[in-house]
């Protein structure tokens, strides 16, 4: 009945937000969701349950008989959740309530350690057969808030290191997995907060700890047995090389020492993560300087050297954490085989490299929004879709013909305001978007992206009169078009800008750096007139008129402004509302403009004789609470539409032959209804209506076209549904097989979902 064809979410900006599992692939936190993905292709699962941001995830061991994967997650909602893959989806089988935000998790075989923002560290024993976490002990890191752990089991006991809001690294020890941890030593040397730790066990009694800090350096510490020769070294010698002084501690009945071994310098900003290679003596580090480095010891000298560097040069991104930047890479991971690395950054997108013949080759990966998605729009032919979110980006997704998966093919708009709505032009050459500003903006496809979509996705969009590419001027805020005339080239076919060179050579979905810089749409027009932030927008089905509304608390500003799309001049101002107009919809033949708003009114304006002007037709108080959305039925139904409201009703209305609005039927729900959309086609002579609620529930309602009072629902299963508000829901305008349709969903949970709906 239901199956997701595509899922898009970005990764949280936290170094502990992701892990790479040998069984499941990438596991990462996406705001309040947990995503499980194949980084080479697509997201396979999304799990909802936490009420706060996911800060850490890890995979737990399974027993030999029952190999169903387990995932443990911690979040700012002060809970740990245990998830198990049952049949075809993950289920939360246990929730542990804690006293503070969960910052980090660490797993070693059946031992799990959890760190919280109140400085408490809790140790659990994991039993896969009983599917249970049992608390063994807890202790408090009195001097720091833990941000990351590293744990190693040696022959004589267990060593747990803790880093966080301090220059120090705290070393705890336990004689066995069932005894409590005691503070054994404190490692000093870093000059700023230590952000990350990672252990490499080298023998039964030795290990190497890697630590990364905001001081931009990585330090290596060797743990080994305390020998008799250590007693003979004088204190005077230690004073002369203080940083190399061994730190002695007892684990069980054995004395061990920790010695600073090496200082790795290569990053130009905070070191966010360090990760040992699964089998080799190699370290992967990621940094806020937008680079990842692979370190290896030289075979002759033993000195650690850089053998691979991925990402960007520091000079190319300019700002650093010292200037308030939140850019760069937030974490890096090896895959379980050790031949691939991934990292994620501010935009939520993943970057992936694979080692081939000693060279690191970049491959396309997955991406998505990092904040709530407010609007989506379909290409009229269903070949691609657009999304707009409060992460201040609009994104274009299309199906890559080689792997048949939906990838982000362009990032048309990278804005300075949260996006609130988006509408695609019927001509397919561009779109209209609005944000938390008084201006709406019109964008058109550049030729580089038109050709990219044709080459990779078999999507044919006419490119006549389109600009070649787009860029953002150094001191500008708008995407500026670049054309042949501006380059001094007479023949437009001969124009080869750097953007055209790079994008024209792509035979795969673009990388994250392409999306951030080279795949912008040129902004061709700004639409002025509103006195407050623009809230909703729409374009008529014939493409001749654009309509916008803004936030308002007075009738003066609660208007719809119409713009003629040839010149983009304001054509008319439609009145009728007294508060914010939340949705604007043109009837299939553009004869009526339907609007609804916070004032609980539904207003209709009818087309005048000149076809560009509209006259006030009717205004009715349709609901008892704010009306969030409305939708027209297919044109064969006449003028039949639905409205959705916070009062938990969807109501159906029809303009009869006497030009009166009649109340036809109503559907009641258990939650506020936030999104509705009629399919623009019939299924076996039935109307199809998709409904989304504030609680994330999604319904498909069917109704015989001869009897508009009989509606039959089908509900999306809870494990597939978002857990937060549905901001917009849209049927794909086309289908290939009768009974197999697609539904596009914009969620407050940061996700864009493409759902396949199979009807009998």
Curated annotation (Swiss-Prot):
GO BP terms, alphabetized: protein transport; tRNA wobble uridine modification
Gene Ontology CC annotation, any one: elongator holoenzyme complex
Subcellular location: Cytoplasm; Nucleus
Pathway(s) where this gene product acts: tRNA modification; 5-methoxycarbonylmethyl-2-thiouridine-tRNA biosynthesis
Pfam families for the chain: WD40 (PF00400)
InterPro entries referenced in this protein's UniProt entry, alphabetically: Elp2, G-protein_beta_WD-40_rep, Quinoprotein_ADH-like_sf, WD40/YVTN_repeat-like_dom_sf, WD40_repeat_CS, WD40_repeat_dom_sf, WD40_rpt
Keyword Iron-sulfur annotated: no
Keyword Nucleus carried by entry: yes
Location (main, coarse): cytoplasm
Spans of repeat WD: 49-93, 97-134, 139-182, 189-231, 266-305, 324-363, 368-407, 414-453, 576-615, 622-663, 668-711, 721-760
Keyword annotations of the record: Cytoplasm, Nucleus, Protein transport, Repeat, Transport, tRNA processing, WD repeat
Function: Component of the elongator complex which is required for multiple tRNA modifications, including mcm5U (5-methoxycarbonylmethyl uridine), mcm5s2U (5-methoxycarbonylmethyl-2-thiouridine), and ncm5U (5-carbamoylmethyl uridine). The elongator complex catalyzes formation of carboxymethyluridine in the wobble base at position 34 in tRNAs.
Domain notes: Folds into a two seven-bladed beta-propeller structure which is required for elongator complex assembly.
Family recorded in the similarity comment: Belongs to the WD repeat ELP2 family.
SUBUNIT field: Component of the elongator complex.
Designated name of the protein: Elongator complex protein 2
Protein source organism: Schizosaccharomyces pombe (strain 972 / ATCC 24843)
Gene from which the chain derives: elp2
């Amino acid at each position: 009945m239901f199956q997701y064809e595509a899922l898009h979410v970005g990764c949280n900006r936290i170094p502990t937000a992701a892990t790479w599992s040998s069984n499941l692939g990438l596991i990462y936190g996406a705001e309040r969701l947990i995503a499980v993905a194949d980084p080479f292709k697509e997201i396979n699962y999304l799990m909802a349950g936490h009420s706060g941001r996911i800060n850490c995830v890890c995979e737990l061991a399974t027993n030999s008989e029952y190999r169903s994967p387990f995932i443990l997650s911690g979040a700012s909602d002060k809970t740990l959740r245990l998830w198990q893959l049952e049949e075809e989806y993950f289920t939360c089988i246990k929730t542990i309530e804690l006293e503070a935000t969960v910052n980090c998790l660490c797993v070693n075989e059946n031992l799990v350690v959890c760190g919280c923002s109140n400085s408490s560290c809790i140790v659990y024993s994991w039993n896969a057969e009983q599917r249970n976490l049992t608390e063994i002990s807890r202790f408090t890191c009195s001097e720091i808030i833990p941000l990351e752990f590293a744990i190693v089991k040696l022959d004589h006991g267990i060593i747990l290191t803790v880093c966080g809001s301090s220059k120090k690294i705290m070393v705890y020890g336990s004689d066995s997995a069932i005894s409590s941890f005691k503070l054994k030593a404190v490692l000093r040397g870093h000059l700023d907060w230590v952000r990350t730790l990672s252990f490499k066990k080298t023998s039964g009694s030795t290990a190497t700890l890697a630590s990364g800090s905001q001081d931009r350096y990585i330090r290596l510490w060797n743990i080994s047995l305390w020998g008799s020769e250590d007693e003979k070294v004088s204190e005077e010698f230690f004073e002369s090389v203080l940083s190399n002084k061994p730190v002695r501690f007892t684990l069980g009945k054995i004395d061990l020492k920790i010695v600073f071994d090496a200082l790795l310098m290569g990053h130009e900003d905070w070191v966010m993560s360090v990760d040992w290679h699964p089998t080799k003596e190699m370290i992967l580090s990621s940094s806020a300087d937008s680079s990842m480095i692979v370190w290896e010891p030289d075979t002759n000298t033993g000195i650690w050297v850089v053998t691979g560097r991925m990402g960007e040069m520091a000079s190319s991104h300019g700002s650093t954490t010292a200037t308030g930047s939140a850019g760069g890479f937030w974490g890096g991971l090896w895959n379980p085989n050790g031949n691939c690395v991934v990292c994620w950054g501010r935009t939520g997108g993943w970057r992936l490299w694979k080692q081939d013949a000693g060279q690191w080759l970049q491959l396309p990966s997955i991406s998505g929004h990092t904040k709530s998605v407010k609007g989506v729009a379909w290409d009229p032919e269903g070949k691609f879709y657009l999304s707009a979110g409060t992460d201040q980006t609009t994104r274009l997704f299309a199906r890559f013909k080689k792997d048949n998966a939906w990838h982000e093919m362009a990032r048309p708009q990278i804005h300075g305001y949260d996006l609130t709505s988006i509408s695609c032009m019927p001509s397919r050459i561009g779109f209209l978007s609005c944000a938390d500003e008084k201006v709406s903006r019109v964008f058109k496809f550049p030729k580089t992206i038109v050709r990219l979509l044709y080459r990779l996705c078999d999507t044919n969009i006419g490119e006549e009169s389109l600009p070649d590419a787009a860029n953002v001027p150094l001191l500008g805020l708008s995407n500026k078009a670049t054309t042949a005339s501006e380059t001094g080239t007479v023949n437009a076919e001969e124009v080869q800008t750097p953007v055209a060179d790079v994008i024209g050579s792509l035979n795969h979905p673009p990388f994250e750096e392409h999306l951030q810089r080279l795949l912008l749409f040129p902004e061709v027009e700004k639409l002025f007139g509103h006195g407050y932030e623009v809230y909703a927008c729409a374009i008529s089905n014939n493409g001749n008129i654009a309509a916008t509304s803004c936030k308002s608390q007075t009738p003066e500003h609660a208007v719809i402004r119409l713009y003629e799309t040839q010149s983009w001049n304001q054509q008319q101002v439609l009145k009728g509302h007294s508060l914010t107009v939340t949705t604007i919809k043109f009837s299939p033949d553009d004869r009526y403009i339907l609007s609804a708003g916070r004032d609980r009114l539904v207003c209709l304006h009818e087309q005048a004789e000149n076809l560009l002007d509209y006259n006030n037709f009717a205004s009715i108080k349709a609901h008892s609470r704010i009306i969030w959305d409305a939708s027209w039925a297919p044109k064969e139904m006449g003028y039949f539409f639905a409205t959705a409201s916070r009062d938990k009703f969807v109501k159906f209305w029809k303009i009869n032959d006497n030009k009166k609005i009649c109340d036809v039927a109503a559907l009641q729900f258990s939650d506020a209804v936030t999104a509705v959309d009629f399919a623009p086609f019939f299924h076996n002579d039935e109307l199809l209506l998709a409904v989304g609620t504030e609680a994330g529930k999604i319904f498909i309602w069917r109704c015989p076209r001869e009897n508009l009072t009989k509606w039959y629902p089908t509900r999306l299963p809870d494990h597939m549904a978002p857990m937060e508000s549905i901001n917009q829901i849209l049927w794909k305008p086309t289908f290939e097989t009768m009974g197999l349709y697609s539904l596009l969903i914009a969620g407050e949970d940061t996700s864009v979902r493409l759902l396949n709906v199979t009807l009998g």
